[in-house]
């Protein structure tokens, strides 16, 4: 299934932005991201566990052995995060292309991502969090400003001008 939330729908200004979100999600399905992410996560977890076990065998129960074991496990998690970011970028690219092919304005992906980024920043501010300081390598999604810019660049020159069909 492909779905969205009411909260996300309230951020949308037109039908093309809704189509952009839906096409982004269809892009995840078409590229089999869920299956690939699960496989990658399993492989990375096994790799991290092997590194932790190996450091325990070679270095014993020393402080260095414990530190290297934790680093191996955390490193495997960071590899999975990087994979998730690349999947989001690919889904954005597919969403822009599908928007254009359906006759919608492909810039709608950029504008809805911009609205989402502004709302996320506002939510963080209202909750007393400084979301801007979260480094990209620690996130499952690419930097919001980069996503907006990349989507606009991808959309430039593509056909499609419809914002609302009715």
Regions found by a protein language model. Give the residues of each.
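Extracytoplasmic and endomembrane cell-envelope/extracellular-matrix remodeling and assembly machinery
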Residues: 79, 84-166
């Amino acid at each position: 299934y492909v779905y969205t939330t009411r909260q996300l729908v309230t951020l949308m200004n037109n039908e093309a932005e809704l189509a952009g979100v839906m096409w982004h999600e269809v892009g995840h399905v078409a590229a089999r991201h869920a299956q690939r992410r699960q496989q990658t996560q399993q492989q990375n977890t096994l790799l991290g566990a092997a590194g932790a076990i190996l450091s325990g065998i070679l270095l014993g129960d020393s402080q260095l052995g414990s530190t290297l074991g934790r680093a191996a496990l955390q490193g495997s998690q960071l590899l999975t995060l990087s994979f998730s970011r690349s999947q989001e970028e690919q889904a954005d690219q597919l969403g822009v292309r599908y928007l254009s092919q359906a006759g919608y304005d492909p810039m709608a992906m950029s504008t809805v991502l911009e609205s989402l980024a502004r709302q996320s920043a506002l939510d963080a501010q209202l909750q007393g969090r400084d979301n801007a300081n979260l480094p990209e390598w620690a996130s499952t999604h690419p930097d919001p400003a980069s996503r907006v810019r990349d989507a606009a660049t991808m959309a430039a020159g593509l056909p499609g001008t419809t914002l609302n069909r009715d």
